C-alpha cells in the first residue's frame, strides 16, 4: 500500500441479492463498521450491486447519510437511444454512483467485450464524473507460459494508451488473475505485488510518475480475511475487488477492518 493512496475495498456482488437483500446488507455492514468506529477517511468502502438494486442501495446510503460508496458492474458505451437492455453512464451517475467496473473477465468472456469496447466504456464513465475500475488479469494458460505480467500490463496499456494524463489519473486498476476468481486459489502476495508494480511502471512510463503513483491498484481473486493482511501489506497493492467474500457481511467487515488496521 502506497503512503499517499487511500485504500479501497470494493465488493462486487455480481448477480446476487435482490433489492430487499441489498438494502439489508448495506444497513448491516454500516452497523458493523459503526460498531468498530471505522474511519472512512483512511479506507474507502464500496459495494457494486446489480442494476436492479442500485436505487435501493442509493436510498439506504442517502437516508442514513452513510459513508459507504457504491457503483455499477457494467455500463453501455452509448448515451441514449434504441439500445434495448443498455444502461448509460449518465443514468448510473444520476443514481449517485462513484465507480463502474469495466473489463471484468466475466464480461469479456460471456458477452463478449473487447479492448476497443472497454476503452469506450472507460471514456463514458469518466465523462459522467465517475471512476472506472478497470479489470485485467491472465488465465491459467498464460500463467503457465510465464507471460502473466506481460499479458496484464498489455491489457492496461491497450485500454489506457490514448487517454489524457488527467483521465488516466482517475483510473482504478483491479488485477484479477482469471484462474483465481471464485476458485479458492489466490495469487501469492509477491505475485500480486509483481503484477501491481509492473502495471504501475507501465502507467508511469506512459503518463509520468505522478499519474503512475496516483492510480490505485487493487487485487481480486479469492480474497478473504485469511489472506487480506499479507496482500495489502505489499507496497503497490492498494485494496481489493472482492467477489464471494463480499456476499457475507461479517467476512466483508473483517476484511475492511484488517485493511484499515494494516494500512494505518
Swiss-Prot record:
It is found in: Cytoplasm. GO terms for cellular component: cytosol. Its EC number is 5.3.1.1. Substrate binds at residues 12-14, 182, 222, 243-244. Gene3D superfamilies: Aldolase class I. Its main location: cytoplasm. One of its GO terms (biological process) is glycerol catabolic process. Transmembrane segments: none annotated. It catalyses: D-glyceraldehyde 3-phosphate = dihydroxyacetone phosphate. It is an enzyme of class 5 (isomerase). The keyword Cytoplasm applies. Keywords: Cytoplasm, Gluconeogenesis, Glycolysis, Isomerase. Pathway: Carbohydrate biosynthesis; gluconeogenesis; Carbohydrate degradation; glycolysis; D-glyceraldehyde 3-phosphate from glycerone phosphate: step 1/1. It holds the Pfam family TIM. Disulfide bonds: none annotated. The keyword Cytoplasm applies. The active site is at residues 104, 176. GO terms for molecular function: triose-phosphate isomerase activity. NCBIfam families: tim (TIGR00419). Homodimer. Belongs to the triosephosphate isomerase family. Involved in the gluconeogenesis. Catalyzes stereospecifically the conversion of dihydroxyacetone phosphate (DHAP) to D-glyceraldehyde-3-phosphate (G3P). This is Triosephosphate isomerase. The lineage of its organism: Bacteria, Bacillati, Actinomycetota, Actinomycetes, Bifidobacteriales.
Amino acid at each position: 500500500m502506497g503512503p499517499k493512496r487511500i485504500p479501497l475495498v470494493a465488493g462486487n456482488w455480481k448477480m446476487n441479492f435482490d433489492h430487499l437483500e441489498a438494502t439489508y446488507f448495506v444497513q448491516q455492514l454500516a452497523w458493523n463498521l459503526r460498531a468498530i468506529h471505522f474511519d472512512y477517511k483512511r479506507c474507502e468502502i464500496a459495494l457494486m450491486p446489480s442494476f436492479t438494486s442500485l436505487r435501493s442501495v442509493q436510498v439506504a446510503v442517502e437516508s442514513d447519510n452513510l459513508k459507504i460508496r457504491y457503483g455499477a458492474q457494467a455500463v453501455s458505451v452509448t448515451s441514449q437511444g434504441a439500445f434495448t437492455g443498455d444502461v448509460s453512464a449518465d443514468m448510473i451517475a444520476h443514481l449517485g454512483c462513484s465507480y463502474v467496473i469495466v473489463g471484468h473477465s466475466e464480461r469479456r468472456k460471456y458477452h463478449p467485450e473487447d479492448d476497443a469496447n472497454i476503452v469506450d466504456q472507460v471514456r463514458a464513465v469518466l465523462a459522467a464524473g465517475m471512476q472506472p475500475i478497470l479489470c485485467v488479469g491472465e488465465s491459467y494458460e498464460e500463467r503457465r507460459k510465464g507471460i502473466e505480467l506481460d499479458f496484464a500490463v498489455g491489457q492496461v496499456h491497450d485500454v489506457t494508451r490514448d487517454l489524457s494524463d488527467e483521465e488516466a489519473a482517475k483510473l482504478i486498476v483491479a488485477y484479477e488473475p482469471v484462474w483465481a476468481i471464485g476458485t479458492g486459489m489466490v495469487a501469492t502476495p509477491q505475485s500480486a505485488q509483481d503484477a501491481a508494480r509492473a502495471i504501475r511502471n507501465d502507467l508511469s512510463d506512459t503518463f509520468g510518475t505522478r499519474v503512475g503513483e496516483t492510480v490505485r491498484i487493487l487485487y481480486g481473486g479469492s480474497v478473504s480475511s485469511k489472506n487480506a493482511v499479507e496482500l495489502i501489506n505489499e507496497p503497490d497493492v492498494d485494496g481489493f475487488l472482492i467477489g464471494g467474500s463480499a456476499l457475507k457481511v461479517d467476512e466483508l467487515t473483517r476484511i475492511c477492518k484488517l485493511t484499515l488496521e494494516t494500512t494505518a
